C-alpha cells in the first residue's frame, strides 16, 4: 500500500497584515492594508513571487514586514510555521542601492556576514567561492567594488545574501538602476540561481515585463495603502530567454497585467 502524498505546507504565510507609519508629529500613514498570501514549500523548486504595483504603493513595506525589519500594525508573518518578529539569517535582503564595503574585496564582502557569525575561515572560503561561482564572479574574488560594473556589484549583493543559505530572499527592485541589457542578464542569472539554491524569492518591481519574465506567481497591488487586487499565475515557460519577451503569449500576459494595474480600483 503506497503512502498518501503529503500536501505541501506554506514556507511563508502572511496573514491579514496591515502596516501604519506614525510620523514625528503623530500623523498616521497607512502603507499596507489586510495583505494575505501563502507561498508553499516545494522541495527542489525555487519559487519566484513578484509584487507588481505603482511606485510608492507599499510594496517595499511588505518586504520589510517579512524581513522582520518592520512589525505589522495588525496581522502576522509566519516562516515555516514560526512567527517572524525580528531579522534572521533565514531571510536575506537585496536592495536597489549598492551596499558593498569599498575597502573589502569581493570575496571578503561575501564572507563578511559569515565572519560575524563566527564561521571558521576554511568554511567561509568554501562557501563564498561556491556562491561566487554561481553568480559568475569567481574570477573577480580578489577585486574591489570600485573595479566592478553596476551589474557585477549586484551580483556581489546576491552572493552575499545566498552565502547565508536563507530560506527566503527578499529583493527590492534590485535591477532598477541597471541599463536594459544588464538587467536582462541579471534576470536570467536570478532564475538560474533560484533553481540551484531552492530559495523562495519575493521580488518587488513596477516593471511589468520584468514581472512576467521572473514570476511563477504575480500579485498585482493597489495604490497606497497596498492591497492585493489580483493573483496571476504565470505559465511555466519551457525557455525563459530574451526571445520570450517578444512572443505573443508573453505580450498577452503583459497586457493582462497592465489592464489590471490601470483599471479603476476599489475605494481605499
Language-model segments: residues:
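Hydrophobic anchor residue at the start of the ABC signature
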Residues: 158
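Conserved ABC transporter NBD signature motif
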Residues: 75-86
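ABC-family P-loop ATPase nucleotide-binding domain
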Residues: 1-28, 267-268
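Conserved signature/switch motifs of ABC ATPase nucleotide-binding domains
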Residues: 143-146, 164
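Conserved ABC ATPase "signature" region
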Residues: 111, 115, 120-140, 192
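Catalytic Walker B motif of ABC-type/P-loop ATPase nucleotide-binding domains
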Residues: 169-172
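Short coil-to-helix segment of the ABC ATPase nucleotide-binding domain corresponding to the Q-loop/switch region
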Residues: 104-112
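Helix-to-loop junction immediately C-terminal to a conserved catalytic motif
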Residues: 67
Amino acid at each position: 500500500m503506497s503512502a498518501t502524498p503529503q500536501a505541501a505546507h506554506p514556507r511563508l504565510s502572511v496573514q491579514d497584515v496591515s502596516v501604519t507609519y506614525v510620523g514625528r508629529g503623530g500623523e498616521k500613514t497607512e502603507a499596507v492594508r489586510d495583505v494575505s498570501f501563502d507561498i508553499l514549500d516545494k522541495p527542489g523548486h525555487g519559487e519566484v513571487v513578484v509584487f507588481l504595483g505603482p511606485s510608492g504603493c507599499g510594496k517595499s513595506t511588505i518586504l520589510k514586514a517579512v524581513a522582520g525589519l518592520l512589525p505589522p500594525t495588525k496581522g502576522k508573518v509566519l516562516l515555516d510555521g514560526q512567527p517572524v518578529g525580528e531579522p534572521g539569517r533565514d531571510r536575506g535582503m537585496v536592495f536597489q542601492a549598492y551596499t558593498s564595503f569599498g575597502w573589502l574585496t569581493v570575496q571578503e564582502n561575501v564572507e563578511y556576514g559569515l565572519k560575524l557569525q563566527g564561521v571558521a575561515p576554511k568554511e567561509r572560503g568554501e562557501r563564498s567561492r561556491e556562491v561566487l561561482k554561481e553568480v559568475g564572479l569567481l574570477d573577480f574574488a580578489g577585486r574591489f567594488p570600485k573595479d566592478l560594473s553596476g551589474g557585477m556589484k549586484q551580483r556581489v549583493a546576491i552572493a552575499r545574501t545566498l552565502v547565508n543559505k536563507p530560506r527566503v530572499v527578499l529583493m527590492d527592485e534590485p535591477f532598477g538602476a541597471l541599463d536594459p541589457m544588464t538587467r536582462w542578464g541579471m534576470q536570467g542569472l536570478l532564475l538560474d540561481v533560484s533553481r540551484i539554491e531552492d530559495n523562495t524569492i519575493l521580488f518587488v518591481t513596477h516593471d511589468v515585463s520584468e514581472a512576467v519574465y521572473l514570476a511563477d506567481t504575480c500579485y498585482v497591488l493597489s495604490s497606497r495603502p497596498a492591497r492585493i487586487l489580483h493573483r496571476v499565475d504565470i505559465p511555466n515557460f519551457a525557455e525563459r530567454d530574451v526571445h520570450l519577451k517578444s512572443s505573443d503569449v508573453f505580450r498577452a500576459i503583459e497586457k493582462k497585467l497592465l489592464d489590471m494595474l490601470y483599471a479603476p480600483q476599489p475605494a481605499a
